């Protein structure tokens, strides 16, 4: 496993982060999403779309590259190679987080993959390429893909492909799955966990389990925003994973914060806490999120239209005798995140189917996450964001 990221990849990671925050803002503009807890994996989606870029040509490739934040496809592939081999590598160090990531390409037996696409998919994306029979065994292939995702995510993501989503007209399925489990460096004492009030966006309140601590915490506070950093045990791993809780001071400030991060993704870096501080009071709710979405409309909203249209050019992917070629019909994405006293367990899967400078906080500060907030899980040495989400009601799914 590589231990450092190439310097020229860091700008690409910043573009990937911007893509993630743009998606988060788009999701938060959906009334159904704003009423529920949400989690998704920007790196999972970004890698899946980058792999599609490897098989795209002409204007379709250009639009994918622009939406994903790069000037050329080669930079996307270089980023994916670094992220897959460094950030998402499966390490087995004692006490370090467990990270498992897998890419898959399932292609109908009637359409051989182009050697150039297959080589790039295997070498840079570490993707498994499997020949399957969509035309007569669509249900069996659906079960095969679902079983593959369920295995990678240790059972947390089930049925990534809904029944009937693959038919005899399907020719290609690309997807990936990501699993993360980490223990806090400083775990919370479950004996002091107790219920307290959490205030919802409609002004009402609920009682939900909160974790408490009297220990010093990594906190920054400025511009109406408090950011909590909860590091995961590192063990012998050179990577450093952390969860960040982004808590707006305004009880209903979560959506304006999401918009601001979309417009200014560097805001996160400016607010990363650099030091531990003593707190008068600290409490954070436990939460568990299971969220699934068909993401093609979200991606179209970001300007990614061509891969889903009849004008799609995916000619670099397969040797296709069909004059109309291929197009992406849907992008299924599912995520699971659980936060409790010992740490975090999280998983995500994406399937694409084809027909700040931190201000010094005052010593009398507190951190009380008793109203809706954003969160993310990040690998700090690279800046790659694995998961983004929001919590509007922590009692749901607990």
Curated annotation (Swiss-Prot):
Region (RCL): 343-367
A GO molecular-function descriptor: serine-type endopeptidase inhibitor activity
Superkingdom of the organism of origin: Eukaryota
InterPro entries with a match to the protein in the record: Serpin_CS, Serpin_dom, Serpin_fam, Serpin_sf, Serpin_sf_1, Serpin_sf_2
Residues at the site labelled Reactive bond: 357-358
GO cellular component: extracellular space
Entries under Pfam families matching the protein: Serpin
Record keywords: Protease inhibitor, Serine protease inhibitor
Function: Inhibits chymotrypsin and cathepsin G in vitro.
Family listed: Belongs to the serpin family.
UniProt note: domains: The reactive center loop (RCL) extends out from the body of the protein and directs binding to the target protease. The protease cleaves the serpin at the reactive site within the RCL, establishing a covalent linkage between the carboxyl group of the serpin reactive site and the serine hydroxyl of the protease. The resulting inactive serpin-protease complex is highly stable.
UniProt-recorded name of the protein: Serpin-Z2A
């Amino acid at each position: 496993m590589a231990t450092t990221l190439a310097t020229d990849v860091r700008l690409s990671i910043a573009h990937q982060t911007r893509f993630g925050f743009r998606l988060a803002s788009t999701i938060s503009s959906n009334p159904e999403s704003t009423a529920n807890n949400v989690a998704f994996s920007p790196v999972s989606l970004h890698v899946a779309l980058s792999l599609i870029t490897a098989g795209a040509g002409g204007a379709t490739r250009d639009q994918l590259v622009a939406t994903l934040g790069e000037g050329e496809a080669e930079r996307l592939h270089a980023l994916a190679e670094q992220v897959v081999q460094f950030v998402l590598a499966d390490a087995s160090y004692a006490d370090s987080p467990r990270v498992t990531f897998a890419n898959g390409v399932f292609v109908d037996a009637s359409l051989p993959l182009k050697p150039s696409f297959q080589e790039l998919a295997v070498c840079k994306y570490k993707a498994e390429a499997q020949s399957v029979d969509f035309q007569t065994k669509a249900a069996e292939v659906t079960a095969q893909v679902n079983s593959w995702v369920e295995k990678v995510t240790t059972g947390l993501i089930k049925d990534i492909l809904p029944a009937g989503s693959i038919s005899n007209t399907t020719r290609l399925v690309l997807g990936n799955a990501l699993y993360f489990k980490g223990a806090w460096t400083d775990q919370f004492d479950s004996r002091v966990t107790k219920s307290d009030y959490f205030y919802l966006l409609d002004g009402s309140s609920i009682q939900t389990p909160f974790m408490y601590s009297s220990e010093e915490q990594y906190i920054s506070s400025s511009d109406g925003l408090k950011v909590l950093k909860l590091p995961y045990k590192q063990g012998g791993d050179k990577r450093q994973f952390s969860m960040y809780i982004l808590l707006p001071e305004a009880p209903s400030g979560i959506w304006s914060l999401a918009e601001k991060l979309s417009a200014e993704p560097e805001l996160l870096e400016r607010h990363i806490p650099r030091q531990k501080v003593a707190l008068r009071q600290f409490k954070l709710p436990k939460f568990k999120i299971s969220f699934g979405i068909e993401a093609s409309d979200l991606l179209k909203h970001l300007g990614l239209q061509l891969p889903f249209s009849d004008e799609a050019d995916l000619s670099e992917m397969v040797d296709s005798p069909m004059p109309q070629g291929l197009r992406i019909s849907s992008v299924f994405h599912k995520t699971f995140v659980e936060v409790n006293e010992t740490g975090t367990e999280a998983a995500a899967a994406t399937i694409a189917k084809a027909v700040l400078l931190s201000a010094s906080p005052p010593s009398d500060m507190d951190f009380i996450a008793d109203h809706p907030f954003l969160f993310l899980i990040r690998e700090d040495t690279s800046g790659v964001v694995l998961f983004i989400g929001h919590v509007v009601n922590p009692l749901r799914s607990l």
